[in-house]
Amino acid sequence: MTELIRIAALFAVTAVAEIVGCYLPWLVLKGGRPVWLLVPAALSLALFAWLLTLHPSAAGRTYAAYGGVYIGVALLWLRVVDGVALTRWDAAGAALALGGMAMIALQPRA
């Protein structure tokens, strides 16, 4: 269980770095925010790429498992940053995605 918590926490930090790296350009392009926001966006995406190298599995498995956590963090972002109420469908989808992540991340190793 400790390994799952460690992996999930690393995935969550990775997801935040990716979301920030994509959200800031969105603010520039859609929200008319200053262009200098592209600098921290690029740094955040570089951090995201580096964080992916810290995950314990092969790249493909890491990306597959990461997707589940990304969905949960993106929904949290939707609620906290965008102020949109989550639906029971959001919660059910996140639960399914996180269950899939756990299966991939915690499978027995040969």
Swiss-Prot record:
Q: Does the keyword Transmembrane helix apply?
A: yes
For this UniProt record, give its keywords in alphabetical order, as a comma-separated list.
Cell inner membrane, Cell membrane, Membrane, Transmembrane, Transmembrane helix
GO CC annotation terms, alphabetical: plasma membrane
The transmembrane segments are 9-29, 34-54, 66-86
InterPro entries according to UniProt: UPF0060
Q: What is the membrane topology listed in the Swiss-Prot or TrEMBL record?
A: Multi-pass membrane protein
Give the subcellular location: Cell inner membrane
Q: Does the keyword 4Fe-4S apply?
A: no
- Annotated family: Belongs to the UPF0060 family.
Name by which UniProt lists this protein = UPF0060 membrane protein Bcep1808_1236
